[in-house]
C-alpha cells in the first residue's frame, strides 16, 4: 500500500516500495492521490490484470469518474510542479538532524527513524533494553496537541511518536514543530521525572 508512503512523502523516491528495490504485482493507493477528495486506485501487472479476463470482470460503480480523475491529475501536477518530493527530502533531513540532536539531550529518546516526511521518535525508559516509555509518549502527544501540534503514538506499546506532516511542510513549519517538541519534552520530563 502506498497510502502513507507514496507520492514522494519519503523524499528519495516517488513510491515507498522503491526504497526496497522491488516491483510489486499489486499497488494500492488512496488518500494522498485525492488530497482530500475521495479517490483511490489499484495498479497491477499485466499478468494480474489478465487473470480477471475469465468471464468474471471487475466492476466498480465509480471507477474512472472524470471529476475524481481530474482531481488526481491536478494533485500529481502540484507534487511535480512544486517539487514536493524534494521538499519532503530537504525538510525531512532537517527534522531528522534536529531529532538526533534532541536524542543526545533526552535519554528517553531511544531511536529516531524515518525518511522524508514520514518520521518517528521511539521513546524508551531504558536505551539498552528499549523498554517502552508509553506514558511519556502519550504525555508528549497530548502536550503537543495542547500547543497546537498533532502527532500520534504508534507501535505495539504506543511509544513511538509518529509524524506525517503535509507535503508542503516548510523549514519554518519544522522550526515550529521543533520548538513545540522541545517545550513539551522539557515539561513532560519535569512532570514524569
PLM regions: where:
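Conserved N-terminal phosphate-binding loop of PLP-dependent enzymes in the Aspartate aminotransferase
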Residues: 2-193
